């Protein structure tokens, strides 16, 4: 029987009333969890965070907030093996890919904990030097950085449910703002468990962390000018968020990370028999296969001198042929499946478009066989 994921809002875990969405194991298509946010009062969830989490965090110095980040990192790391297993179960990740996400999360929290410990022992951060404001030396001024009195709303992508959650939360908590995190529904199982751990360990002040598992519903309609939104995902969805009427009217700050475009460039002076050439091929293959290519830093363009095209194509095809694709729980598997059917459809559509302009040098556009 699949698990029923709960959101964590208003200081308590809540389940949606209807319209359950299913989370699957990408390897088997088995439903591993279901979730919904139907019936959850988004306005109340935000108000609870503003009225409880915000004041509690603002009372703390940067060093004290940094200490919380360190505690969060340690609490999650203590459950590392469990989190890695969930990453494979709901994300289709190999052990190595799961570590990339989970260890990235705890490492980021630890990094900002160390950084925060070097900042002010007060709740404020001085910005620049004291400036003379008039002829009299008695009139001086200085800028200070202070926390906003709202909620940091984080809408995250499906590919990094651990790291994406932690890297956004770390900077918000260090800045003295409560967090409402909404993971992509398809891979929310990992984030949900991380939140459960942090709540059980009582790491954060009440209201400093909220979780939505499922649709955001009318969440954006209840934001104020003191709230902020950080979104990772497609440019189209980012545009919809930026264009939300309430966000425009309230002047809500919105940060969007979307549709990265990355390249690997081989210089014209490169020797095809050199160690550096081999490294180039290995790194390109890694970017294609790590997390099945489902990451923002994946290489989309490989730029090589025309006279090296055949050599690079042959070497890259050989490198990819050695990668075993299959059930990520099995030994020797280097690449797991795509996360869901929509990702498969998107990849196949992309391949079809590319073949109008390019020639395939390895594989085909079918789903393919998986080692089990």
Q: Language-model features: where?
A:
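Rossmann-like NAD(P) dinucleotide-binding subdomain of oxidoreductase/dehydrogenase enzymes
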Residues: 121-278
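N-terminal Rossmann-like NAD(P)+-binding subdomain of aldehyde/semialdehyde dehydrogenases
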Residues: 1-137, 322, 339
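ALDH superfamily catalytic-core signature
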Residues: 200-202, 228, 236-372
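A conserved hydrophobic position in a structured secondary element of the catalytic/binding core
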Residues: 24, 233, 304
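Short alpha-helical
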Residues: 40, 78, 82, 93, ...
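Residue-level signal for inorganic ion chemistry
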Residues: 29, 65, 87, 176, ...
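Short, cationic motifs built from Arg/Lys/His that form the positively charged side of catalytic pockets
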Residues: 62-65, 182, 301
């Amino acid at each position: 029987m699949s698990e029923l994921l709960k959101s964590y809002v208003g200081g308590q875990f809540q389940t949606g009333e209807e319209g359950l969405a299913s989370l699957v194991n990408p390897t088997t298509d088995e439903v591993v969890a279901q979730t919904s946010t139907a019936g959850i009062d988004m306005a109340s969830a935000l108000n609870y965070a503003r009225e409880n989490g915000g004041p509690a965090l603002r009372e703390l110095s940067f060093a004290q907030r940094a200490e919380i980040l360190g505690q969060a990192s340690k609490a999650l790391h203590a459950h590392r093996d469990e989190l890695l297993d969930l990453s494979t179960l709901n994300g289709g990740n190999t052990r190595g890919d799961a570590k990339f996400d989970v260890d990235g999360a705890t490492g980021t929290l630890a990094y900002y904990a160390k950084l925060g410990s070097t900042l002010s022992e007060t709740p404020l951060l001085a910005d620049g030097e004291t400036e003379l404001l008039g002829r009299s030396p008695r009139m001086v001024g200085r800028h200070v950085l202070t926390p906003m009195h709202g909620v940091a709303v984080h809408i995250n992508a499906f590919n990094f449910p651990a790291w994406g959650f932690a890297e956004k939360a770390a900077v918000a908590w260090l800045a003295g703002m409560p967090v409402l995190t909404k993971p992509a529904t398809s891979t929310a199982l990992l984030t949900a468990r991380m939140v459960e751990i942090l709540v059980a360990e009582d790491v954060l002040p009440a209201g400093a962390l909220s979780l939505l598992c499922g649709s955001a519903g009318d969440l954006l309609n209840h934001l104020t000018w003191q709230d902020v939104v950080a979104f990772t995902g497609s440019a189209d969805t980012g545009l919809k968020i930026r264009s939300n009427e309430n966000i425009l009217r309230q002047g809500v700050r919105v940060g969007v990370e979307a549709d990265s475009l990355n390249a690997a460039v081989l210089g014209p002076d490169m020797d095809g028999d050199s160690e550096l050439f081999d490294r180039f091929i290995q790194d390109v293959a890694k970017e294609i296969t790590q997390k099945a290519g489902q990451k923002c830093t994946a290489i989309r363009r490989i730029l090589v001198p025309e006279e090296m095209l055949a050599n690079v194509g042959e070497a890259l095809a050989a490198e990819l042929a050695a990668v075993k694709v299959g059930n990520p729980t099995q030994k020797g598997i280097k690449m797991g499946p795509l996360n869901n059917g929509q990702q498969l459809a998107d990849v196949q559509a992309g391949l079809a478009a590319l073949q109008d302009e390019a020639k395939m040098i390895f594989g085909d556009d079918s789903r393919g066989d998986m080692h089990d």
